[in-house]
Amino acid sequence: MAILGLGTDIVEIARIAAVVERSGDQLARRVLAPAEWQQYLTHAQRVRYLAKRFAVKEAAAKALGTGIRQGLAFAQFEVANDTLGKPRLILHGRAAELAADLGIASLHVSLADERRYACATVIAEG
């Protein structure tokens, strides 16, 4: 297998907090897939959860070589966790089609956060 794409994104959590303060859950509704939205509603640290998901989705779109455009939407990238808590990506719609067209067989996710920032890296392998 070969690396077909790499994307990294860093998000200042305070910026996400400011958007949520101004517009309520509008950003979360636009960014989160349905399963993520349900987790968001009950999460103890909603802003941090949203910032981390945002970072992963931006990194994934960069790994596909497009960013969020050309028919891609944030909600087409769903972040889930395995039984050990490791993040993984599930692609839907145009994101899944694009990954298949590019020959991407797997996406590897690294996600980190600390007090001020959330950072994600996605490697596309095929």
Curated annotation (Swiss-Prot):
Major enzyme class: transferase
Annotated transmembrane regions: none
Subcellular locations according to the entry: Cytoplasm
Cofactor(s) the protein requires to work: Mg(2+)
Binding positions for Mg(2+) per the UniProt entry: 9, 58
Major localization class: cytoplasm
Pfam families assigned: ACPS
Catalyzed chemical reaction(s): apo-[ACP] + CoA = holo-[ACP] + adenosine 3',5'-bisphosphate + H(+)
Summary of the function given for this chain in its UniProt record: Transfers the 4'-phosphopantetheine moiety from coenzyme A to a Ser of acyl-carrier-protein.
Name of the protein in its database record: Holo-[acyl-carrier-protein] synthase
Organism: Edwardsiella ictaluri (strain 93-146)
Lineage of the species this protein comes from: Bacteria, Pseudomonadati, Pseudomonadota, Gammaproteobacteria, Enterobacterales
